[in-house]
Amino acid sequence: MLEGPILAVSRQTKSVVDIPGAPQRYSFAKVSAPIEVPGLLDLQLDSYSWLIGTPEWRARQKEEFGEGARVTSGLENILEELSPIQDYSGNMSLSLSEPRFEDVKNTIDEAKEKDINYAAPLYVTAEFVNNTTGEIKSQTVFIGDFPMMTDKGTFIINGTERVVVSQLVRSPGVYFDQTIDKSTERPLHAVKVIPSRGAWLEFDVDKRDSVGVRIDRKRRQPVTVLLKALGWTTEQITERFGFSEIMMSTLESDGVANTDEALLEIYRKQRPGEQPTRDLAQSLLDNSFFRAKRYDLARVGRYKINRKLGLGGDHDGLMTLTEEDIATTIEYLVRLHAGERVMTSPNGEEIPVETDDIDHFGNRRLRTVGELIQNQVRVGLSRMERVVRERMTTQDAESITPTSLINVRPVSAAIREFFGTSQLSQFMDQNNSLSGLTHKRRLSALGPGGLSRERAGIEVRDVHPSHYGRMCPIETPEGPNIGLIGSLASYARVNPFGFIETPYRRIIDGKLTDQIDYLTADEEDRFVVAQANTHYDEEGNITDETVTVRLKDGDIAMVGRNAVDYMDVSPRQMVSVGTAMIPFLEHDDANRALMGANMQKQAVPLIRAEAPFVGTGMEQRAAYDAGDLVITPVAGVVENVSADFITIMADDGKRETYLLRKFQRTNQGTSYNQKPLVNLGERVEAGQVIADGPGTFNGEMSLGRNLLVAFMPWEGHNYEDAIILNQNIVEQDILTSIHIEEHEIDARDTKLGAEEITRDIPNVSEEVLKDLDDRGIVRIGADVRDGDILVGKVTPKGETELTPEERLLRAIFGEKAREVRDTSMKVPHGETGKVIGVRHFSREDDDDLAPGVNEMIRIYVAQKRKIQDGDKLAGRHGNKGVVGKILPQEDMPFLPDGTPVDIILNTHGVPRRMNIGQVLETHLGWLASAGWSVDPEDPENAELVKTLPADLLEVPAGSLTATPVFDGASNEELSGLLANSRPNRDGDVMVNADGKATLIDGRSGEPYPYPVSIGYMYMLKLHHLVDEKIHARSTGPYSMITQQPLGGKAQFGGQRFGEMEVWAMQAYGAAYTLQELLTIKSDDVVGRVKVYEAIVKGENIPDPGIPESFKVLLKELQSLCLNVEVLSADGTPMELAGDDDDFDQAGASLGINLSRDERSDADTA
């Protein structure tokens, strides 16, 4: 249950412009936003601050609501709700209060290394009162370790970083809807009263015009039965509802005379088969709707009901239904059915009568991380409450203490269950800084109490007008979750009730004011809102007579300027952070923009990051708030700087040292590395970025590289979105990334003795052991490839009866001679790299290990992956493709000054996909690289000079530009600037005014017949790397049943020769090849051993036998009681068993043990 004005609302953070040392971007923005984007992690941080009641949060609340305001945190709320817990007789009670935390036990790095939680011990004050003796006992009780949020908005659970995603749910309240009856085609109306916790109450008018009620989804009964059960007389019902014929006819036909009969009637419908009594029936009705323990509207439900029905009043403490609520709901329903448009509420207010749209954001609210954890703690405490009651009854009253009553296990189990298994607690996406940031701002309609992807229809997934400025209409996944998972818009924040608000500038009588109001979707419906690019003069007066505005339900209209109430604060208000980083978004089709927003999250951080020539102005802020940069909170002078740490002497004389994270593995296996940006002796200001993180450059989000791109077909090699790259990109490591894999092995106690980590491995040459140290662990810096030993380990074998010779050896050499198996950890198939880290945990060193584990070793292997054929590249406009060919630099097309292009994209990738933004980005990219100089005196530049800001008339080569979404560079500006681009050092202008250049074929030296569009595009290397997908096998594991190879790279499986491949072989008449593929190369068990023998002995390949899968098919048919047998040519039944003697003999002669265990790592063929 949400409490008061307590749930944190996002606070304004430092403006981007104030970030010291920020790189300059030349912006084409025409609209200046009156406020900056709120803190991008406030959604997570503020909600958690409310839950645990941090001192900063309390200070903010007091500042907002005054010193005297009562401020309670989320945990305090639940303890108040639960207390006091009384025994069944009411003689004893236990109250819990004052939740408080001790210091966190381990640092974040220790928690990650030791695979434990980053958590703080939670204590509460428990007070036991014996009402008969008046005795009070008070104790501090330890509730358990409570996971704490890091300053980046994440949790460390069992050593891995996780994010709790905010959940979009239907808000508690009262909802009216309309359906059309199929038989009569008349509109029928219904209403649901939905609580936060408790039974649903539903009223409806059926096709026979009777008003009915359903309690808790049970059988329908006349609504007047419920009213009479509540104590209403026929006269009272007639007085209140006499205006409605359908209510009067329902009253006449309800068949109950008084309150007692009505109560018994309800009881019979709710509990069929039980013998009703008046008291039972009364308590059933009371418990259903009027007892706070069983029924809870929550503050948000009470707020929605009062607002919808015009009931006024605060009703702050009243979280159950009242008779007035029920009566007004029924009146609203019958007036709605009668076609009335307005009604007068009980307190005299005129309210509109209309149905509700369940997909409207006024009816959907967010459960943020604090509320989700609070609900889970509530579940745990209610389980604990039952235990406390039982113990109060069974224990001796004299000796009871609070500690003896409380069993904290249900609470800690509920918290552990939520973080470990809930659909909303997710493994954090750490592919790059942006993916982590957008993961924390994700909104999910799935999860407990939400929708399921199977049942969700088109309507709930679709974009709704009320999403504007609250949830991004573009950023959503492409699969079965489309529309169910969204992203918070850039300016949005969450209000105390959990509704998403977005800011607007107040307009009074056609004049802008400095007032910024945050409106919910419900409130916004009552106002007329203008666009952010509405023209106004220096005093704020709107200059246009008529203004384009947005009305209720997303309708667009033209109205007089005095009719406008509000104006958008920024053109990028409607999109999320990820989408706001797509330049020229306004020129892209929404489907491709969706792919572009999603693919930015899949970009791998490169060894050398580079800021985009063409940005949107959001890069700085996204990187700053993502939490991967090192930012100094103090001003001072850099005293010491190295790759590992930076020391700053602050102005107040204190030294601050910042440790940098070097080459650590992320959740997705990419490399997390921080690099210093400051120099020794440099002056730094508070809030300045002093070190870059992964995928950032100079404190800006930099996920890819600026590449010189040409749009042209090239010998068919870039057909169907294939990409041609310059070999130079490979050689200069322009698209090279580092990937880190973690390999873990443990030495356990087995029934036959303890496993041992050792260098002494049986039957292994010294050459193989060259990189192992004396413990048997690989040294740091060793280059390893697949099959190399990382950690030597031996496991005791089951011992058989020893021969006299073995007994003699055992007597001479002791234990060393006993039988052990080599179970060393080796580099998996297909992996190579350099060992960059070793972690050794041992029980002897008092490390906390799992039961039965004596030692655990983790090896980190880093791999430098250059770009290669088969890797996936993408731009920011959904223009993705796979590298099809890497050409030598001398074969690439080149500009007249000799500059070869980096990448060739096919022209067919543009028109059909309607993502023209990529072409405009290419043109502006060239301009940013070459620079431009506009002569204001030149008459040809007259129009350009009018629209361009003064600082954009002269821009040097290699500058960074920003073209904000919906407010960027126009086509006219781009073509005007292309005509004024700066020449190269030889004085030649390479690209014409139309953005095209004459390219020369690198192979022949001849110019191409037509000019080619050329410029710089920002390209990302995506996580879909060919190294992780390509797979080949010669011998490997088999399935025991079918005797066919397993499938998939993870199982080291074979290639499936499927139905269509068989048809291809048949089409070419390749009968023998096909027979081999289906038998001896696959599952003809006898045949494949004989073939192995024939190859070894140099004989001819024998005829194939019967495949094992055919035998399996026969067995399956026989198991269905079908008598299936194989007949020979003369019609006699054949026995399918192979010649096992030959089979075993052949195997033995080849040294193959055919009777060994079927193990995936041992059984190879």
Swiss-Prot record:
One of its GO terms (molecular function) is ribonucleoside binding. Its EC number is 2.7.7.6. One of its GO terms (cellular component) is DNA-directed RNA polymerase complex. It catalyses: RNA(n) + a ribonucleoside 5'-triphosphate = RNA(n+1) + diphosphate. One of its GO terms (biological process) is DNA-templated transcription. Gene3D superfamilies: 2.40.50.100, 2.40.50.150, 3.90.1100.10, DNA-directed RNA polymerase, beta subunit, external 1 domain (2.30.150.10), DNA-directed RNA polymerase, subunit 2, domain 6 (2.40.270.10), RNA polymerase alpha subunit dimerisation domain (3.90.1800.10), RNA polymerase Rpb2, domain 2 (3.90.1110.10). It is an enzyme of class 2 (transferase). The keyword Nucleotidyltransferase applies. Coiled coil: none annotated. It holds the Pfam family RNA_pol_Rpb2_2. HAMAP family: RNApol_bact_RpoB. DNA-dependent RNA polymerase catalyzes the transcription of DNA into RNA using the four ribonucleoside triphosphates as substrates. Belongs to the RNA polymerase beta chain family. The RNAP catalytic core consists of 2 alpha, 1 beta, 1 beta' and 1 omega subunit. When a sigma factor is associated with the core the holoenzyme is formed, which can initiate transcription. This is DNA-directed RNA polymerase subunit beta.
